[in-house]
Structure formats: C-alpha cells, structure tokens
Amino acid sequence: IGHYHVTGPALAHVYKTLRANDPGSRLVAFVAASGSAGTLGAGDWLKDKFAAEIVTVEALECPTMLYNGYGEHNIQGIGDKHIPLIHNVLNTDGVVGISDQATDGLNLVFNTKIGKDYLKSKLGVDPAIVDQLTHFGFSSIANMLAAIKTAKSLDLGPEEVLISVATDGSELYTSEKEKLLAANYAGGFTKQQAGEIASRYLMGADTEHVQQLDVVARERIFNLGYYTWVEQQGVSIEDFEIRRSAAFWDALHKMAPVWDELIGEFNGRTGVGV
C-alpha cells in the first residue's frame, strides 16, 4: 500500500518530468525484482494511471516464476523459492530471469577503477553516469538488466519508456566484491576482463529467459503460492483465493486514508504528532 501511494506517484513524477521535455514519450512498463513484492505495488499504480505493464525480475539460478524452478543465488535482497502473499500476480505482465553471474560481474565493473575507466574510455559512457553507478547494488543491477531485456523483447523504440528503481547500493556488497576479486582475479582485475564482463552481460543482454504472461501463466504462478501460504503458513484458503479478485486489491489500496487517520489519532494521544 505504501509503494502504491508513495513510490508509484514518485516514479510518475519522474516520468512526467521526462515527458515535459519529450511530449511524444510513452510509459510502457515498470520493471522490478519481486523480493517481498512490496515495490511491485508501484507498478500497480503506474498500470492504473498509465496502463503500464508490470514486469517482475527473479534470479535465473532460482527461476520460480519462469520455470517453477528452485536453487541458490547471490542476488541478495530479491527473495526466492516462493510467491509473496502481497504480490498481485494476476496483474503482472512479464517475468525476466537474470543470472547472479551478471550482477556479481557488473558490480566489479561499476565499482573498481579498472572497470570505471573501461566504461569511460572504451564505451564512451559519460563520467557523471559512471559516478552514479555506485548506487547500483545487486538487485538494482538486476533491475537494469531486466529493463534492457524487456526493451529488446518488446522491440521498443526511442519514444517508449521503461521505468525501474535502484533498490540498493553497492556499499552493501563491498565484502562480496572483495571475495570475488580474491577468488577469481587474484592476479589483478584487468581492463580486458572488465570488457569481457560488460560485453557479455551489459551489451550482450538478450531476450533469453523473458516470458510475457498470458492468463494460463499468471494462474500457474498464482497457484504456486498455495504451498507456501496455505499448506505451510496456515493462511486460510478463503484468504488465499480472494487475492485473485481485482476488487480485493482495489479495496486494499483505499485503506491508506484510514491508516493515515489512525496514525494521526495515535500521534495525538501519545503527544508525538507534528
């Protein structure tokens, strides 16, 4: 609910600012990793207001939505092996799988001097943009790569806009960077190796492991949640099933003003109101 009412409008403001300078632009999709699925609420808002599609991202090493798969991965913070109860699955339009080898590798390129120099000198990336890449952690890189794959899959043009979020920063993964450097690049991380990573995972991002969801695929993903929430966590079948209805989610989104009122009352009673 918070992401629906706060993150969604914030992203819409970004898009409207872009559109003010490019009136012909059109918002096509919101792309974000599932995790606990809260962030996807922003996509629900953007779909309501702009008819944008919602594309979810998951680790290719644990492709729960894509292939009913399982496994371990290193894209920390995006969750795996279950469908979150608050994920509005039947409102989701696509799924993209991203390998943790891509996020691990690009984390090195984005956060080492060798990697940054390669981006600037060989690829001609604006130094100001390179400096901002430190704000992209594993899940943020996954979102970016999934957006690239989505754009290619949908054959989007220059006027068609995808929007995503940088949900974590690289400072969370300094130890992961050092561990990978020690394990795979003990002799030093070279510009050639940075180029190989960027070529394979950034410029080489393709349309593999991208699925546009039809009704059957949405129902398949929704049904996967039964085993986690009903059989294991004890959620009633009625509460599980009601989430199929768009009316349920519409009613949920209308709860924010009620919560605001209750928060105001609580703050007033405790003397912490502003």
Per-region residue spans from a language model:
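C-terminal, well-structured subdomains that either form a transmembrane helix-short loop-helix hairpin
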Residues: 133-153, 164-170
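Active-site/ligand-binding loops adjacent to catalytic centers
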Residues: 19, 46-136, 175-274
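Short glycine/serine/threonine-rich phosphate/pyrophosphate-binding segments
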Residues: 30-44, 64-65, 138-147, 173
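ATP/nucleoside-binding phosphotransfer catalytic cores, i.e., glycine-rich phosphate-binding loops
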Residues: 109, 160-175
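Generic beta-strand/beta-sheet core signal
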Residues: 33, 57, 98, 165-167
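A glycine-rich, Thr/Ser-enriched phosphate-binding loop motif common to dinucleotide/cofactor-binding enzymes
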Residues: 1-11, 135-142
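Buried hydrophobic positions in well-ordered alpha/beta secondary-structure cores of metabolic enzymes
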Residues: 11, 30-31, 54, 95, ...
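Phosphate/pyrophosphate-binding loops at sites that engage ATP/ADP/AMP, CoA/4′-phosphopantetheine
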Residues: 13-24, 151
